[in-house]
Amino acid sequence: MRCAAFEKRITATVAYDVLDDGFEVMTSVFPALVCKTIWTAFRHHSSGLINLLTGRIRKKSILADWALSQGMYITVTQTPYEFYKNLSQHSLTGLEDHLTQDVLLLAGEKDHYIPTNQYYRLKGNIHHARSLTCRLFTEAEGGGQHCQIGNHMLAVDTILKWLDQVYGTH
């Protein structure tokens, strides 16, 4: 979506799944008080506190350990603080008005990874897209989890049908 905001040769973009703030995603796996502490420590560049706190939490939470390990691997960073510095650049805030293409937003209602509020926030902040299609998959249809784990074909079918609609009319 960031690319689509700046590259007008892109005529359609799919957010599978939505993600408008990477830092928020990677701190939402923590309890509220810990999340607030990490946000405050990050604003004060307290790398030692962040690394210590996340290190302790990773020992207690498989999800937090996986999320941080995977994130540091993908971003080629060595510490949680470096990872958070990298993530702070992964935001769509202020870029939504630059999305003028056809846009498809996908999310799962029970996503364990990306807070559902990001789906609603992004949906509410895209005003200049040629078209905006939003799909929140449910548990009942088997698509309520992150990237529709358990029913990938539901998402794939939705994307393919949407692409047929978009490119069939342009």
Language-model features: locations:
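Active-site nucleophile elbow and catalytic-triad environment of alpha/beta-hydrolase enzymes
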Residues: 77-95
